[in-house]
Amino acid sequence: MSFDKKLLEIVACPVCKGKLDYEKSSQRLICKADHLAYPINDGIPVLLENKAERWQEAEA
């Protein structure tokens, strides 16, 4: 099952309530403000702080 990008309009980071970005290559939702990555399992975002991983933006 793939992730429905329309969800990005209604979901928010559970830590800061900020915007999340979809990272297709790793199937994660990224909070750039908190540097957290939330997994997407079977098309469903797991927006639990204890399931998030630290995220660092790749250098261009």
Curated annotation (Swiss-Prot):
It comes from Shewanella sediminis (strain HAW-EB3). It comes from the Bacteria. Belongs to the UPF0434 family. InterPro entries: Trm112-like. Gene3D superfamilies: 2.20.25.10. It holds the Pfam family Trm112p. This is UPF0434 protein Ssed_2824. GO terms for cellular component: cytosol. The lineage of its organism: Bacteria, Pseudomonadati, Pseudomonadota, Gammaproteobacteria, Alteromonadales.
